[in-house]
């Protein structure tokens, strides 16, 4: 599957981890697990919980430079119920999948 190289802004990640590769790997592992858990909870969550999950994911994504995930999470956070929310969940799921794939590549290369 093709994914944008910008799924994670590596310069931002390195800045946030002070260039410490071990810390970078740890932060990426934490985000990877958190993102998988939060995405898994979205389908059965009520509106209030969806907003809280999207907000949590938005903050975590910004911290590692996964700006497409953060943007998609913010879109979900602001979405209305129904079709708009379904589309926002789809965009977020795709962005998370791309970020997690890049994380896998980064961790495998480390």
Question: Where are each of the predicted segments found?
Answer:
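Amphipathic, coiled-coil-like alpha-helical segments
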Residues: 1-11, 22-41, 60-75, 82-110
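Hydrophobic residues in alpha-helical segments
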Residues: 17, 42-46, 80
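Helix-loop segments that flank and shape redox-cofactor active sites
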Residues: 37-52
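N-terminal cationic amphipathic segment used for targeting or macromolecule association
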Residues: 52-54, 97
């Amino acid at each position: 599957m093709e994914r944008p190289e910008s799924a994670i802004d590596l310069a931002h990640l390195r800045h946030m981890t002070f260039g410490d590769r071990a810390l970078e790997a740890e932060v990426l592992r934490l985000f990877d697990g958190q993102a998988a858990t939060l995405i898994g909870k979205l389908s059965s969550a009520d509106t209030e919980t969806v907003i809280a999950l999207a907000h949590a994911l938005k903050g975590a994504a910004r911290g590692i430079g996964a700006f497409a995930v953060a943007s998609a999470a913010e879109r979900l956070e602001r979405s209305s119920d129904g079709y708009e929310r379904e589309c926002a969940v789809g965009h977020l799921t795709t962005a998370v999948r791309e970020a997690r794939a890049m994380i896998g590549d980064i961790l495998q290369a480390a």
